[in-house]
């Protein structure tokens, strides 16, 4: 059995109604309406213009389905028949007015006529049936986030669920208000002693700070390597003078030797420590030759003519007077035509092309200084009244003027004292603390105090 498509069935029903309407004899035999309505022949007689009675086909019962693909093979022949029926208008043959005859056979299809004017818009038809739902469309873009809705009533507490996995750490919240101080907890147990850390690297040497207070004694560490020998400690207090020993017997005098040849004159010896005795006045000498007058304006440092010697511009001048402690420091000076004062001998020296020559054989002594008799201090023999006698005039050793050196005598004991009074040796703030300036200070214990030294900022 052939099952027709709803669209095809609707087209067949339209054609069936059209064929029934076109047969008036069949309608009159079934429903006699000739008395109420004029017949089709009367209409043909009264109107010569009308050729045929054509009724518009009723609307289809079912809307045609929407085809996306190709047409169905069952619908293609039916659509062709429908197009042929719609395109073939029924022809009308004009004849003489006579009695209506039987309907003739259907003539051949004529040519399509001209397209008539567009008719008025018809009434709105009845809404058709709801079509089939189309395929789901492409999901659209998400719309903007709407305003949060009103908070609903709090629901009842549900059953305790299973503990879920720990979530990711959220952002740090704002700092809360400080809470109330809690109660003091119980003292915890003492932990195990941790391992001893490794020894760190030595840091950079810092600036010399002030001496702090002595801290508590630390634990004894491991024995390190033996360091270098330190400098001797401070000089102790002067002890009591010991008893004089017994003088030994004098030695036997040796035989007298032969007199030797007279040698060249030696260098001047150290000044005598004895008291000078004024001798007798000698006879008056012969008058000397007449000299020239060296009269002129008074010469001093502030005078502009100070640079010009009274003997002329070519005469040498003494640049400065140096103060040295001993012979070693005197030999280090290489300045020509200079005058130096030796503190150990208390005498002046002058340097020319031959070297350093003494120009003052009698040493200077301060007021109230007792001059010892010759042949006592400095001969290398310890005699009564002498604490020591090393036989040299060096004031930087442990024996100064036949007295033992002590802190406060004004002479720096080399190797024992850092300073003594104003004697710092060659040390200054610039050499003791490089990069600083100022004056060093000597404490009562003959140690250097560098507090007055300041650094450049």
From Swiss-Prot:
Any one annotated GO CC term: plasma membrane
Key words of the record: Collagen, Disulfide bond, Neurotransmitter degradation, Repeat, Signal, Synapse
Signal peptide: 1-29
Any Pfam family: Collagen
Keyword presence, Plastid: no
Heparan sulfate proteoglycan binding: region residues: 129-132, 234-237
Keyword Signal appears in the UniProt entry: yes
Region (Disordered): 89-289
Post-translational modification remark: The triple-helical tail is stabilized by disulfide bonds at each end.
Compositional bias segments (type: Basic and acidic residues): 117-126, 181-199
Biased segments, Pro residues type: 100-111, 133-151, 262-271
NCBIfam families associated with the record: myxo_disulf_rpt
Family statement drawn from the similarity comment of this UniProt entry: Belongs to the COLQ family.
Function, as annotated: Anchors the catalytic subunits of asymmetric AChE to the synaptic basal lamina.
PANTHER family according to UniProt: ACETYLCHOLINESTERASE COLLAGENIC TAIL PEPTIDE, COLLAGEN ALPHA
Protein name: Acetylcholinesterase collagenic tail peptide
Gene that encodes the chain: Colq
């Amino acid at each position: 059995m052939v099952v027709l498509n709803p669209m095809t069935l609707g087209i067949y029903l339209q054609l069936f109604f059209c064929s029934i309407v076109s047969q008036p004899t069949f309608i009159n035999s079934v429903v006699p309406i000739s008395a109420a309505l004029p017949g089709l022949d009367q209409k043909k007689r009264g109107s010569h213009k009308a050729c045929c009675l054509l009724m518009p086909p009723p609307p289809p019962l079912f809307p045609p389905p929407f085809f996306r693909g190709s047409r169905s093979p069952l619908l293609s022949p039916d659509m062709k028949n429908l197009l042929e029926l719609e395109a073939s208008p029924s022809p009308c043959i004009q004849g003489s007015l006579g009695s209506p005859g039987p309907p003739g056979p259907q003539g051949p299809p004529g040519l399509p006529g001209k397209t008539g004017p567009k008719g008025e818009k018809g009434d709105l038809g009845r809404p058709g049936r709801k079509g089939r739902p189309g395929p789901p469309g492409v999901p659209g873009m998400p719309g903007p986030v709407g305003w949060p809705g009103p908070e609903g009533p709090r629901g009842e507490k549900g059953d305790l669920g299973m503990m879920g996995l720990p979530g990711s750490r959220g952002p740090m919240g704002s700092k809360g208000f400080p809470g109330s101080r809690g109660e003091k907890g119980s003292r915890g147990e003492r932990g195990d002693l941790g391992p001893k850390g490794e020894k760190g690297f030595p840091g950079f040497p810092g600036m010399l700070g002030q001496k702090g207070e002595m801290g508590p004694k630390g634990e004894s560490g491991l024995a390190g390597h033996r360091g270098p020998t330190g400098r001797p400690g401070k000089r102790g207090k002067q002890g009591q003078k010991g008893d004089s020993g017994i003088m030994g017997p004098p030695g036997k005098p040796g035989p007298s030797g032969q007199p030797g040849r007279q040698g060249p004159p030696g260098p001047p010896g150290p000044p005598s420590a004895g008291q000078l005795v004024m001798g007798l006045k000698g006879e008056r000498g012969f008058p000397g030759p007449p000299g020239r007058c060296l009269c002129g304006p008074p010469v001093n440092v502030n005078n502009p003519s100070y640079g010009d010697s009274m003997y002329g511009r070519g005469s040498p001048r003494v640049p400065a007077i140096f103060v040295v402690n001993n012979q070693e420091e005197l030999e280090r000076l290489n300045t020509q035509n200079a005058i130096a004062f030796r503190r150990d001998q208390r005498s002046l020296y002058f340097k020319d092309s031959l070297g350093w020559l003494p120009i003052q054989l009698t040493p200077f002594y301060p007021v109230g200084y007792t001059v010892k008799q010759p042949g006592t201090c400095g001969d290398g023999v310890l005699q009564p009244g002498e604490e020591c006698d090393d036989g040299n005039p060096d004031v930087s050793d442990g024996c100064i003027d036949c007295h033992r050196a002590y802190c406060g005598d004004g002479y720096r004991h080399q190797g024992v004292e850092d300073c003594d009074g104003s004697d710092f040796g060659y040390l200054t703030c610039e050499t003791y603390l490089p990069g600083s300036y100022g004056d060093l200070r000597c404490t009562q214990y003959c140690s250097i105090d560098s507090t007055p030294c300041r650094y450049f900022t």
